[in-house]
Amino acid sequence: MRNAALPSIAVGFFDGVHLGHRAILEGAEAALTFVDHPLTVLAPEKAPTILTTFEERVRLIDRPVIALPFTQCLAEMSAAEFADRYLKGYKVRCGENWRFGKSGEGNAEWLKRYGWEVEVVPYVMHEGAAISSTRIREALKAGKIEDAEAMLGRKVTVSGVEVSGKGEGRKLGFPTINLKLGVYAAQVNGERAVVNYGYAPTFGERGWTEPTMEVHLLKYLRKERQFDSPEALKKQIAADCERARS
């Protein structure tokens, strides 16, 4: 199956499309991924909160994508059937821990044994450890925006439905990314901003949805808290804005 003319395909779930994923994607002419995380079928109780929606992943992969719905049928497929059906005619680029087929029986060595040309891309490191989607999730849960940004290789971007309250301000409902609750310095439509991610405890859950918007998070400012009055909240917002500008 070795043939210099074969196109290369990068394989993986690519959640977040971080620097490690980009190393795998580099030089590949196409990418093979799953629409949903495999654990949503294999072990739903262990399925992680995803960093990027499917649409965002495809945009960030930035090359032709073969997207497979991860179904129970696919989970039961042998490595031989999966490789024959989806990898035939390609040179494969993958990460060190990539596996495929029922119970993960297939990997890079399996493919090489059966004649595939495979390039295993080493882990990309950050502060002495391999970059992974799990590490980025943990950084975001801890409010460590700078660490997440360093591993992603870009600004932390979240997309969500804008919810407008009764003149009290605006908040965002994010369907995917799991962030530490609190107030963030951010950038919206090119302008510096302060964004509250949480439950708006001072005013309660009032509001209506408006079009989806995109926010670039810059740094974590403080925990979310309830204020005794709208005036106290406004004073704190002014202080938050001053910190966001610094």
Language model features with spans:
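N-terminal catalytic cores of NTP/NDP-binding nucleotidyl/phosphoryl-transfer enzymes
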Residues: 2-53
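Conserved beta-strand termini and adjacent loop/short-helix elements that scaffold enzyme active sites
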Residues: 1, 32-34, 67-70, 121-123, ...
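Residue-level signal for inorganic ion chemistry
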Residues: 18, 61, 92, 148, ...
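A non-catalytic, amphipathic alpha-helix used as a structural packing/dimerization or gating element
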Residues: 23, 56, 147-154, 232-243
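Glycine-rich, Lys/Arg-enriched anion-binding loops that position phosphate/diphosphate groups
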Residues: 107, 114-196
